[in-house]
Amino acid sequence: MLIYIHGFNSAPGSFKARLVGARMHALRREREYAVPALPHRPAEAMALLCDLVEQHPGSALIGSSLGGYYATWLAERYALNVVLVNPAVRPHELLSGSLGPQKNLYTGAEYELTAQHIDELRALDVAAVTPGRYFLLTRSGDEVLDYRLAVEKYRGAQQWVIPGGDHGFGDFENYLDVVLAFCGVVD
């Protein structure tokens, strides 16, 4: 199973999730692809992801932004391979300045980002990673996250730091073949 883990205030309908889904469909492997709609509470999101991974042992993960943070915790707990796309490294620090009302731009759902969310994120922090499990795909022009934090966190992992670009990784389709190869979907 290939599991795509979307980011903060995102959803299964995100650009990159749809691209991966379309490619899996073209490969006639859509039944091997899952994009769960994650709850905004980190503990609830992680419970949902753990259930999915436990139902499909040996899954590969693609984690984008906050989804990369979640994927890192899952990779270390379940020994999974992960492609990280502009991953959040310390979201508990980044989001602590954004407490208050939030709106998911894809679903329209509104909620309050609280200190409890931050505490739940902090509890998922992984101090040291197993580099061979990861392929980091990041853009130096990411306007939301400092790509250098990911380069440092995943030192020793396969890394592609692509100059310029932005957090949304608008040309993700150009890298889809290598992403799917790392995940074991294609040769």
Question: What are the functions of these language-model segments?
Answer:
Residues 62-71:
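Gly/Ala-rich beta-loop-alpha elbow adjacent to hydrolase catalytic centers
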Residues 57-60, 133-135:
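Short active-site oxyanion
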Residues 18, 22, 72, 148-151:
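Active-site phosphate/pyrophosphate- and oxyanion-stabilizing loops and adjacent acidic/basic residues
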Residues 74-78:
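Aromatic pocket-lining residues of Rossmann-like dinucleotide-binding sites
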Residues 1-56:
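Active-site catalytic motif of lipid deacylating hydrolases and related acyltransferases
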Residues 6-10, 65, 140:
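Active-site glycine-rich loops that stabilize anionic/oxyanionic intermediates
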Residues 81-187:
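The alpha/beta-hydrolase serine catalytic core
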